[in-house]
Swiss-Prot record:
CDD domains: ASKHA_T2SSL_N
Major subcellular location class: membrane
Topology within the bilayer: Single-pass membrane protein
Cellular compartments annotated: Cell inner membrane
Transmembrane segments: 274-290
One GO BP annotation of this record: protein secretion by the type II secretion system
Keyword field: Cell inner membrane, Cell membrane, Membrane, Protein transport, Transmembrane, Transmembrane helix, Transport
Name of encoding gene: outL
Name this polypeptide is given: Type II secretion system protein L
Originating species: Pectobacterium carotovorum subsp. carotovorum
InterPro entries referenced in this protein's UniProt entry, alphabetically: ATPase_NBD, GspL_cyto_dom, GspL_pp_dom, T2SS_protein-GspL
Pfam families xrefs: GspL_C (PF12693), T2SSL (PF05134)
Ranges facing Cytoplasmic side: 1-273
């Protein structure tokens, strides 16, 4: 394996100036057509224009060489365009939400392989026109396995011919080793060995202009084929595949890793070690919210209980009223009307303790209630579950009234009794 080491020696001789911001290089890796073929790689400057180091070899040879560059700006992995087939499709906007499910069935009639064995990636969409790359799943799995074996953190995995510049009026062409790569304006890409390249071009005639980024031209190895015009082959500044791959501005959609092969997002990888802590914290929050909700529910139940108790007492005092919405406001209305008759204050002073007693002894029901304003006394017919309840009520009432106990009797499972409560004043 050949590795250029000039950059390392220059870096050792040329110290960094103060204030210089160190920029990480970028890494380009090209996987071979054959599984046991040589893997090519280059480390280039952050802008991709300068070669810093390069090499080729097997996974066992390349991995330790790449380990010397743990921090890179980006890593782009090129796969052979010969293993990828491109199709043009019309993709209505309403179908794009489910594009991964729709595309395989749109292409099913054009494919010789079962769609279950193929991977589909939409590389670009312009209006309603889309370019779809189709590759066998076992090849995708092999490429990803090779990347893992090399210890790569891949940013983009794409067909090698897709890094060629795009020309609206013609094809782009580049020779790499013994392979010619072509990119069409539609986004389709082709590749052919040099020995077959002429046949490929002849079969595609009439040809548009071909913008070549390699030194080879019509006058060279392709001279044996008939051309319409000499000007069809337009020489461009000579460059190489790795330079184009490092300097190309690639959209995110050009990545073949879509659908089942889509990479995990960086933030997901960052949060993965904290997943257990996050789950525990979420459970804690759930318990806190549940406890707060239960406490709120209990308070609501208590408030509802006392509201119902107020309604019950009010209806016992005023049995003729059936519509009780706000017992407190309705009681105040009664007191205001009574006060207009001159006995309001005395009634209020005696009624307040009675309301408290009925609230404290919720098991006791008022069967009837009358008030004698002249005597200043309440006459109550009460009903409870036992003699003890009525006696307890009588003892508590003695703190506020002069109590005169009447007859008590057992009626089925209830105890009834009468009390006269007179003001202590």
């Amino acid at each position: 394996m050949k590795i250029a080491g000039k950059w390392k020696r220059k870096a050792a001789k040329a110290p960094l100036h103060r204030g210089t911001v160190a920029r990480h290089p970028c890494l380009i890796v090209r996987l071979p057509v054959e599984e046991q073929g040589e893997i090519e790689w280059q480390v280039r400057s952050s802008n991709g224009e300068s070669l810093l180091s390069q090499g080729r070899g097997s996974i066992e040879q390349v991995r330790p060489a790449l380990a010397a560059y743990p921090s890179v700006t980006f890593t782009r992995v090129l796969v052979p365009a010969t293993d990828v087939t491109f199709y043009a499709l019309t993709l209505p906007r309403q179908a794009r939400r489910h594009v991964t499910q729709v595309v395989p069935f749109m292409l099913e009639d054009q494919l010789a392989t079962e769609i279950e064995k193929l991977h589909f990636a939409v590389l670009e969409i312009h209006g309603d026109d889309g370019t779809v790359a189709v590759v066998e799943k076992n090849r995708m799995q092999r490429w990803l396995a090779q990347c893992d074996a090399l210890g790569l953190s891949v940013d983009t995995l794409l067909p090698d011919a897709r890094v060629l510049p795009k020309h609206q009026d013609g094809w782009s062409a580049l020779q790499h080793d013994d392979m010619w790569l072509f990119r069409q304006p539609t986004g389709h890409a082709m590749a052919a060995e040099s020995s077959w390249c002429g046949d490929l071009l002849k079969a595609s005639m009439p040809l548009p202009a071909i913008y070549s980024y390699s030194a080879a031209s019509v006058g060279g190895e392709l001279a044996q084929y008939e051309w319409q015009e000499e000007g069809e082959w337009k020489a461009q500044p000579e460059t190489d595949l790795f330079t184009l791959a490092a300097t190309a501005h690639l959209p995110a959609s050009v990545d073949l890793r879509q659908g089942d092969y889509a990479p995990d997002k960086a933030w997901q990888n960052t949060l993965l070690p904290w997943r257990g802590v996050g789950i525990a914290f979420a459970c804690y929050l759930l318990l806190v919210v549940a406890d707060a909700g239960w406490a709120h529910y209990q308070l609501y139940q208590q408030a509802e209980h006392w509201r119902q108790e107020s309604v019950r007492v009010y209806r016992q005092i005023f049995p003729s009223e059936t519509n009780v919405v706000n017992p407190r406001a309705q009681m105040q209305q009664h007191l205001q009307r009574t006060a207009a008759g001159g006995a309001g204050k005395a009634l209020l002073d005696q009624l307040t303790p009675l309301q408290q007693l009925m609230t404290q002894n919720s098991a006791i029901k008022i069967q009837s209630l009358s008030y004698d304003g002249a005597a200043g006394e309440f006459r109550l017919a009460l009903q409870g579950t036992s003699y003890q309840e009525l006696e307890q009520f009588q003892q508590q009432a003695a703190a506020y009234y002069q109590v005169q106990a009447g007859e008590m009797r057992q009626e089925n499972d209830r105890v009834e009794g009468r009390l006269t409560l007179r003001s202590q004043q």
